[in-house]
């Protein structure tokens, strides 16, 4: 995979020490943290959603990869802060600002502060199969057309 290009859209990211280019928290981290590129604290009311900019654009280029914006586990578990779209899928050819839909699913207001780590970005491989229209499948699987709950709970 070639290098992923990152374009700084907001000068705060390079000029303000509270902000920074995204990094991995540890050597074993799969994703990089995305920070809230806001000027002042933002109160997200219980049950509300807000679209928050990151001040960054990312261009993957290689169609065999995509970006995924995922929630941070601590924010979700401790504060009920998750993504409004649950997972953000960023196509390889997208060049606009990375935006994060933040949803406060808790019963209490949440204050998002400038430069707070609010989500994570992971680059993943993408399978790009050809699709063949058929009238019948060539094999019958053990599952067949069994849908929601067909295998039980235990």
Curated annotation (Swiss-Prot):
A Gene Ontology biological process annotation? dUMP biosynthetic process
A GO molecular function for this record? Answer: magnesium ion binding
InterPro entries for the chain: dUTPase, dUTPase-like, dUTPase-like_sf, dUTPase_trimeric
Give the catalysed reaction(s), semicolon-separated.
dUTP + H2O = dUMP + diphosphate + H(+)
Q: Which UniProt keywords apply?
A: Hydrolase, Magnesium, Metal-binding, Nucleotide metabolism
Q: What is its EC number?
A: 3.6.1.23
Q: Which Pfam families does its entry note?
A: dUTPase
Which sites bind substrate?
72-74, 85, 89-91, 99
Give the matching SUPFAM superfamilies. Answer: dUTPase-like
Cofactor(s) demanded? Mg(2+)
The protein's matches in PANTHER family, at most eight in alphabetical order, are given as:
DEOXYURIDINE 5'-TRIPHOSPHATE NUCLEOTIDOHYDROLASE (PTHR11241:SF0)
Query: What exactly does this protein do?
Result: This enzyme is involved in nucleotide metabolism: it produces dUMP, the immediate precursor of thymidine nucleotides and it decreases the intracellular concentration of dUTP so that uracil cannot be incorporated into DNA.
* HAMAP family the UniProt entry points to: dUTPase_bact
Question: What family is reported?
Answer: Belongs to the dUTPase family.
* Name this polypeptide is given: Deoxyuridine 5'-triphosphate nucleotidohydrolase
């Amino acid at each position: 995979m070639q290098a992923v290009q990152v374009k700084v859209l907001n000068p705060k990211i390079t000029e303000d020490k509270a902000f920074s280019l995204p990094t991995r928290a540890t050597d074993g981290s799969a994703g990089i943290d995305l920070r809230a590129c806001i000027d002042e604290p933002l109160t997200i009311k219980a049950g509300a959603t807000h679209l928050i900019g990151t001040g960054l654009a990312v261009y993957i280029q290689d169609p065999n990869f995509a970006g995924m914006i995922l929630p941070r586990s601590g924010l979700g578990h401790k504060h009920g802060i998750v993504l409004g779209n649950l997972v953000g899928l960023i196509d390889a050819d997208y060049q606009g600002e990375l935006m994060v839909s933040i949803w406060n699913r808790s019963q209490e207001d949440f204050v998002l502060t400038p430069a707070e780590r609010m989500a994570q970005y992971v680059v993943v491989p993408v399978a790009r199969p050809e699709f063949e229209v058929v009238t019948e499948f060539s094999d019958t699987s053990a599952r067949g057309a069994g849908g929601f709950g067909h295998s039980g709970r235990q």
